[in-house]
Amino acid sequence: MKAAVITSPNRIEIQEIDPPEIKANELLVKIKNCGICTLEQRLYTGEMKIYYPIIPGHEASGEVAEVGKDVISGIKPGTRVALDLVIRCGECYYCRTGHSNMCLNRFNRGNRVLGGFGEYIAVKPAQVFSIPDSISFQEAAFAEPVACCIRSLKKINLHLAEDLLIMGAGSMGQMHLQAALCMGARVFVSDPDGRRRTMAEKLGAFLTIDPAREDLEKIIKHHTDGRGVDACIITSPAHVALNSAFNVISKTGRINIYTSYHDKPAIPTDANTIHRTEQVVTGSEGRTEFDFFQAVRLIVFGKVDVKPLISAITTYAQIEAGMQAAMSKDTYRVLLDNKAG
């Protein structure tokens, strides 16, 4: 089978490898689509290292090709599925306490890490989520990032009729926006890119703000009777977004640092302010199985529309260009189409 393999930093190549052999309790899935996420980009550039060579890809969809003889879930060959490819061990402290997104072994080489850039993959039945014919394989490939947004919103304990500010309107910001609207929030979106603000408006944002040209704090305070927003999610890695969040949050407000910062900036607040205001600062990383289940349903129900976020489709023959396109600020998501050659 074909697979796009990252062999070293800034080097990805198409290799012919043996398809995986499934165990009696596993499924063989033919991959249809896989998103090129920030994780794949960081593996490609060497910013993040798991091991080399590695078949990346964790935002995937496909069709069941073979079912192991001991599988008891009733799933059949031909079933269309969304795939949960960042697997958990199910045995460590975090898995056993409901925080499988913190699994100590999720990037253990023995766990068949990732793999969505291959034509086929062997998975456990718990890793597949059936999808109806009403959604495409391309849409189903967004289940994983939508699940991460659901986890993020749970971390700030977003309530009905609260005000939420999303800092950054890239693909994750747009998916956060739609998931938050499902929860009954009034959503503000801040981003200096006019095209991204326009997309957020089309997807239902109450108000979009250009933080480079407008007074973010003044606008937020105006629309919240001087309080500030109840919650803020930072999806942009820009330091100015992190700094601004603490100026627009209300007393008892919650901030989720969703994005990662490899330069590890200090949080721009102090212990006494947190003490006096009861503000909560948290982060979120990945998602759990339940988050993934909910994400699939939101896409199927049409509550989260990911189609506008598909910026380009790439193939094995164009994988290098696809990687470069995925890293451009002009794109939302680039998908690898594994059936297109």
Which residues does each PLM region occupy?
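N-terminal glycine-rich cofactor-binding segment
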Residues: 4-21, 36-66, 82-83, 100-114
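Glycine-rich beta-strand-centered segment in the early N-terminal region that forms part
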Residues: 20-34, 47-93, 127, 132-135
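Residue-level marker of beta-strand positions
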Residues: 59, 79-80, 94, 120, ...
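NAD(P)H dinucleotide-binding glycine-rich loop of Rossmann-like/cofactor-binding domains
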Residues: 89-167
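Glycine-rich cofactor phosphate-binding loops and adjacent beta1-alpha1 units
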Residues: 156, 203-280, 320
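Residues in the short beta-alpha loop(s) of Rossmann-like NAD(P)-binding domains
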Residues: 193, 261, 287
